[in-house]
Structure formats: C-alpha cells, structure tokens
Amino acid sequence: AVNFSSTGDAADCVGCHTSHTVYRKNDEQSPSYDLNVAGLCSGCHADSVIVGTYFSAPEDSLAAASVALYHETVHGTRITDTGLVVSATCSDCHSPHRTLPGDSLASTLHRDSIATTCGRCHEDVLAKYAGAAHGGRSSGDAGDGHGHETPNCVDCHTAHGIVGAHEPNWFLHTVEECGQCHERLYETYLGTYHGKVTELGGELVAKCSDCHTAHDMRPATDALSSVHPTNVVATCAKCHEDANESFARYYVHGDPMNRAEFPLLFWPWVIVTAYVVGALLLFNVHTGMWLWRNARHAIRERRELRS
C-alpha cells in the first residue's frame, strides 16, 4: 500500500484478484489459489524493472533472486512438481494483505517472528526449537555473548533457497553453517577424523546435527541434551553400534594447542612435533654431510687422475 500510493507500481487488489472474475481462494481458477500464488507474485518480483528499482543494493541480492530460488527449493518444487497445496508459498510467509519489511516489529518475518511463522507448518520443530539453546530469545537479547544474534530458521535454512535436509549438498555444508557462529568449535571439529573426512566430501561421518540434533540442541550440562554424560553413549551408538563409556570419552572438540584444558593432547603433540622436526633436521644434516663427502671424494679423484 505504501509503494502503491507513492510510486504506483505495487500490487493492488485488482492486480492480485482481477476485477470482475474474482474467484474464491480455494478455487483452482483463482490467482490466489495455493498452486498459483508463486506465479502471481512472480509477475512483479521477477520483473527486471521492479527488481532493479527496489532490490539493487548488494545486501538485497538474495531478495532480488527470491523467485528463481524459490522454484528450485523444497517448498517450490512441491508446489510446481507435485501439486502439494500444503507446501509453503509466498502468502504463507509474507501475509498477503499486510506485507511489511522484515525489520518491522509487526512483520511476520521480523527476527522475533520468523520461528512462529515457520512453526505454523512445522509445529513439532518449533516445539523443539523453543525449548532449546537457540530458541526462546528475542533479537534484543545479547545473543551468544560473542557478537552473534541468536539464530532462527532463516539463518540456517535461508529464506528462499531452502533445500531438503536429506540433500547431500546441504548435509555437507551444514557444518559451515554452524561454524559461522561457533568458529572455535568449527576449527576443532575440522581437526578430528569426522572433520577431515567431511572436508574431503564424505557424507557418512558425523556432522554437528548428528551429535547435537538439528533443533533440540542444549548445553552438555542439561540432562535432556544429546551430549549430556548420561546420553552421549547412546548418541555415539547411533553410528557406532558398539560404543561404550570409554569410547564416548573421545575428545570431539579437543584442541592440542590448549595446554590447560587438554594436557593429554598438548604434550603428545609437543613430543611428536619435536620428534618429527628433530628427525627432519637430522636427515637434512646427514644428507648435507653425505653430499659434501661425495663432492670432496669426486674432487680428490679428479686431481689424482690429472696427476
């Protein structure tokens, strides 16, 4: 309404519902029928002039590509390929008659409202998220204490580029998603067997969500946490059937550089590093002496031949 009154290029009632052939929303002939909404919105949001006018800033690049992204995602393909009318379409998230900017407190897509908006379809996920470490906080909170806002659905899944969690590409990159906030844990993960195989493209080794769950992650001190001492063996056993308490004591995020917290990793690292460096130095010294000896021997032989 604001853009329509000021510039005249925004959608109005007739633009979405037509003028005289107005059908009910549940009528397949209606432009606002669930299977038709994405195409209806594309009329403006795929228009190069409108996109260039309102979404030309670098930070709006994803919004500018929203139509193309949506049609390739799990929501869009369910609509276009299978005709699944319960799959989320534009009006389910943006509210058709009160579409507000994402920074508006009244918007369904404000940071404080996104989880509730997604939860209208994903009720079970919302229930887990709300009681977990990431849920139950607002954008006004201090976040995680390290300069990161508390993540919501869009931070992990994106807004329009949502792919199925079963997709190999998503599963491989979920570690990077978590690492954007958990930098230190990301680095220590990459130093483990799981992390190294993941970097090589391995899909079967454990990722963050395998151990911490996807939406119900909690501190290790929480008895409901999948990594609480009473639960961690069962968590490991999901992949390692013979896992026991000794197996579960493995340093998942051990840092060999942290002497105070991981002395059993630090000192072996120091000893092995010193051994390897010492062996290489000895090898280089020995090789240099051997080459020098051969060179002197060759020079001596030439002199003897000349004489």
Each language-model region and where it sits:
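Short sequence/structural segments immediately N-terminal
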Residues: 1-307
